[in-house]
Amino acid sequence: MKALLYSGLLALALAACTTKPEAPKTDLYQEITASDARYDSSLATRLKADEYGMHQYVLAYLKSGPNRSQDSVEAAALQKAHLENIARMAESGKLVLAGPFLDEGEVRGIYIFDVPTVEEARALTETDPAIQAGRLIMELHPWYGSAALPLLTPLHNRLEKKSITN
């Protein structure tokens, strides 16, 4: 019995000695930027980047609207429909960023649209059930930002464990 115990311990000790140690984890920013990144004209063209790597978008501030008197059931239904509308616009590629502000101020959240005009962004915001119900209003502005923003949605999808629309 002792021989069996010693044999088992010896096998574990040998396995521990031969197992490769886990590689140290690198900082994600370093990992992403460590490559010999140079200007990529093909990527710049696909993302509609100008010579500075920038692109024009439309920024929308979602503000509290004049009609916030819905009961909790109706407010929850509007919020669900609002989130489903966000998902639909993101899937179309026209909405590249969306999110709420975490305070209780008048400005409730933002959208960044990848559309050429404020008018097109306005038409998209008018599809939102919360806008239609007057629970939210939009303030729209042309905005100039990184042309890489459309890459956020596919990257986010790799991080999202649970969907906001479920």
State the predicted function of each range.
Residues 2-8:
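Sec-dependent signal peptide recognition
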